Amino acid sequence: MTTMSDLSPDLVGEILTRVPMTSLISVRCTCKMWNALSKEGIFFKAARKQFMGFTMMDSRVCSMKFDLQGIRNNEHDFVDPCIKQIAKLDQIEVSKVLQCDGLLLCVGKDNSRLLVWNPYLGQTRFIKPRKRFNKLEWYALGYDNNHNYKILMNYDTGHLFGYEIYDFSSDSWRVLDVSPDCHIPFHQQSVSLNGNTYFLAQEKIIVEGEEEEVVDEIEKFLLCFDFTTERFGPRLPLPFHSDVLETVAISCVRDDQLAVLYQRFETWEIWVTTKIDPTAVSWSMFLSVDMEPPTGCQFDDEAGSFFIDEENKVAVFFNSDLFNPRVENRNRRYPTAYIIGQDGYFKSATLREAPDLVKPDPYVYCCPLVWSSYAPSLVQL
């Protein structure tokens, strides 16, 4: 009689690609061989075959899994309809979720506390900010060359502006004396790569005799915060020129590359980095599509998100649409997934119906994907 211990490593790896990532910790306990294979990285290789992400709905964190096999078949539904709320995180209402190498940083809705979660190990850690400011705070999660994790916080009350950093090893906050010569909007997305965080930033204009003024029409660029030096790097150029009417957003590719989206009307471009570090970047075109006839799809660079599938040469976008043609209620927002391919391939699917809103709010019921191709982390919290 064949037992689980008799299965080959290759077959085990295939089995693991079909296991929900949040259940892998239970699978590790199945037998000694599977536990040993996890330590050798088999779990991590299998994990990268999945397109799994975490999303936020109604201030709760949910896991999402996507099957992109056979997407060119019109009968194939590319989105797994199962979206599972993470019961372990029900203890906190979340306003934003960030990730770094398999760890999630959940920002409390009232900014009074932070929660770090390792989905693979099932461990959590609450962190209380040193001070409570307002909703214009933003956070970033990363680590230094010694793999010591840290959290960067920026606050801007209109009267007070500054940075603080939390060190996991000392369990303490301290003021950070940095001041980048540019503006990082609090609503902009950030991406963690190799322990550092990359932001979309824009120039900050100082008008004589008046307070600082930000001019929205100027170019955007990348800015990296290095968690080893605890300093911002130089401005890193994007592979295109953009203005205020055009959409720019960033995402990660397998946690070792960065992807940038550029949308101008019905033209969509996605570029990926061929080299990136805190001081230099180079780019290569991944996808360029002119959507004819027009689809009417406008990516929300504040609430939307995306990831790319290199094997199928497609990009999957997640948006929170105010209008759904099947239900003409403009007081609702509908989390929607779009898939776009090189040859004009286009599909869309509403992930769920949002509750009524008293007043339409572009920041409510948004559905930002945190990351895909999730790789588990063995970092202890």
From Swiss-Prot:
Pfam families in UniProt: F-box, FBA_1
NCBIfam families: F_box_assoc_1
Highest taxon of source: Eukaryota
Domain annotation F-box: ranges: 1-47
The protein's name: Putative F-box protein At4g17200
